[in-house]
Amino acid sequence: MSTATKQRSPKRGFTGWHMVAVMSLFFGTVISVNLVMAWNASRSWSGLVVENTYVASQQFNGKVAEGRAFQASGIKGRLTTEPGAIRYVLTRNGEPEQKIDKVIAVLKRPVEEHEDLRVELHPRGEGAFVLAEELKPGQWIAAMMAMAGDAVVHRQTIRFIAEGRDK
């Protein structure tokens, strides 16, 4: 009796080429996502918080002392915005502050530099200073500096949301 054995071809399982394809797809996806994220990050924010971190660290204690002195002076600032205007009112112990000559504001976006503005607000009496400026809608950071003569008497940083005219 002769039995003819039929040879079956071995089933092709998971081969090295399959592993190469899986690894290529995985790392290709990771690298592609990283490139897209890096491109978006480089277009939206410089990443610069301070120009020189060592110098900033040396100035930290002085800035803390200055902040405590401003707080002890009793001067408080309140920023309000409306379409086409920014209003900053300074008070000392609940009364309008009269000794301040000018207020300078640095208006900037939290994550971009190209829309930053440095402006001087115009006095309107009763401790109020106004800027007739149309800000684009969205989040802003206002670094306010109130001055009497050449001396800075109050400094405040305020985060706010400017609304557009259509709201």
From Swiss-Prot:
Protein name (record): Nitrogen fixation protein FixH
This protein's UniProt keywords: Cell membrane, Membrane, Nitrogen fixation, Plasmid, Transmembrane, Transmembrane helix
Source species of the chain: Rhizobium meliloti (strain 1021) (Ensifer meliloti)
Coiled coil: none
InterPro entries for this protein: FixH, FixH_proteobacterial
Record's subcellular location: Cell membrane
A GO biological-process term: nitrogen fixation
Pfam families reported for this sequence: FixH (PF05751)
GO terms for cellular component: plasma membrane
Function: The four proteins FixG, FixH, FixI, and FixS may participate in a membrane-bound complex coupling the FixI cation pump with a redox process catalyzed by FixG.
TM region(s), chain numbering: 19-39
Entry superkingdom: Bacteria
Principal location: membrane
